[in-house]
Amino acid sequence: LDVAVDGPTVGIDMESPLDNIVGFERAPKTDAEKKAVEDAVAVLRAADKLFVVDPAANCKLGPVDLRSGALGLGNPDPAEPVGHADLDATFSFNCTNASAAKFIDVNLFGAFKGLRQIDSQIASAQGQFKRQLKRPAGAQASQPVRLSWGK
C-alpha cells in the first residue's frame, strides 16, 4: 500500500494477489466466484469506507481505478506474468488541506478476510515512512487499523 500526499491529493496505490481479495487467483468460474468478485469490486469502489483519511485534511473520494487481467478490470500491466493474478488499484482523494493528514484508518482487514499483513510506504511533506500493519486478532479483526505518519 503506497500513500502519497501531494498538493491537494492523497493518493493510495494498492497491489494484492487476488487470493487475498476474492479467495482465488484466476478468472472466476462459478456463480459463487463471480458473486465474490462483484462484491469485492463494490467494496473497493466505495474506497472512502476502506480508507478513512484524517478528517483534518477534509478529503472527498475522487477517481478509483481497478486493474486486473484475470477479472477483466481496467488496463492491466502488460508486463504482468501470465497466470499471476493480482489486483492493482489506485484511489484518489481530493482534499482542501491534504498536508494536514497524519493518518488513514484502514479497513481492509475487515473487508477482506484473506489479508494478513499490509506493507506500506508513505510519502508526505513530513518525509517518507515505512509501516507494516498486521491483521488484529480475534474480535478486533474487523476494526480499522490506523496507518499514521509524521509528528
Locate each region found by the language model:
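N-terminal soluble domains immediately following signal/targeting peptides that reside
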Residues: L1-K151
